[in-house]
């Protein structure tokens, strides 16, 4: 059973710079069954979703950092690193970002994009080959995220 659906995005926010993020949302296949179990125990799903997203984001951010070290991790990238925080959008939606934020350091977020996707050949600096360090880190943590989410839900639903 997959508990959370995650997807990777590079966003340009008008006037607010670039954000390299992993977005995660709670998506359960047996959602009705889970809700019924939690309702019987008078459990609220909001704290469960927050905990699942936070722990998933922490695992993912750690993997991104480890992968970035191997692929030319710069001081600017360290300064632009996002500290994962779960935000509640509405009653049923939560968001937790990981990656690099240009609001903290624009050069760091841009460096992360260039190291991940590469650049075309340039006269001054040559071509930067794509490493896909961000994308690989997200894919490599998929099973860990699923396992921790499953563990959290099963603990609460017992």
Question: Where are each of the predicted segments found?
Answer:
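Short, hydrophobic/proline-enriched secondary-structure or compact coil segments at domain edges
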Residues: 93-105
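Short, Lys/Arg-rich flexible segments
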Residues: 2-96, 117-158
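Extended Gly/Ser/Thr-rich low-complexity repeat segments
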Residues: 106-121
């Amino acid at each position: 059973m997959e508990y959370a659906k995650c997807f990777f995005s590079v966003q340009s926010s008008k006037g607010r710079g670039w954000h390299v993020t992993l977005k995660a949302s709670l998506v359960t296949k047996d959602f009705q069954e889970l809700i019924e179990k939690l309702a019987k125990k008078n459990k609220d799903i909001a704290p469960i979703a927050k905990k699942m997203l936070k722990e998933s984001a922490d695992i993912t951010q750690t993997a991104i950092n480890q992968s970035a070290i191997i692929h030319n991790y710069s001081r600017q990238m360290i300064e632009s690193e996002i500290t994962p925080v779960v935000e509640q959008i509405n009653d049923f939606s939560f968001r937790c970002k990981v990656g690099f934020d240009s609001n903290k350091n624009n050069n760091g977020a841009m460096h992360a994009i260039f190291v991940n996707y590469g650049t075309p050949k340039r006269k001054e600096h040559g071509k930067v080959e794509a490493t896909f360090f961000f994308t690989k880190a997200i894919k490599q943590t998929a099973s860990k995220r699923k396992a921790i989410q499953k563990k959290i839900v099963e603990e609460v639903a017992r």
